[in-house]
């Protein structure tokens, strides 16, 4: 009993803790096969629609700006990568702030020459970057030639504090490994 009372008092005194009621989470799945500008515009339309339907956390598909291109090994796809703070973050930072929502926006990250990641921003409702996740488990199977493109992530599994709760991000194959869910 005392432990329960202590935990409740501790949680409510934490400025980052609030009781979340009726959170609506939108997971957007759509076909992306155009250039980055068109794909980002299409994703933005769906973010807008989800927010207007009451979603407070909106998750976009893997590699949302570029599309999933890993079915073939082609060096031209490296041209689709962007640095941190690039077009994906810029677009969804403005949109998250405008709509007051959290957006999980996966993208093809160019960390430095020769080092690329399959990454995702967690953009808070004020437009700031609340988190960055780099996919840890990289498959190399027929139609999933990801090791040709991506270096395994080095940021670990952790959650990001946002105005709409703590968000733990995993990308595709990472969800098959139980430690990822336990640690985020």
Short names for language-model regions:
Residues 82, 94, 111-184:
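Active-site catalytic loop in hydrolytic enzyme cores
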Residues 26-28, 58, 168-170:
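Hydrophobic positions in the central parallel beta-sheet of the AAA+
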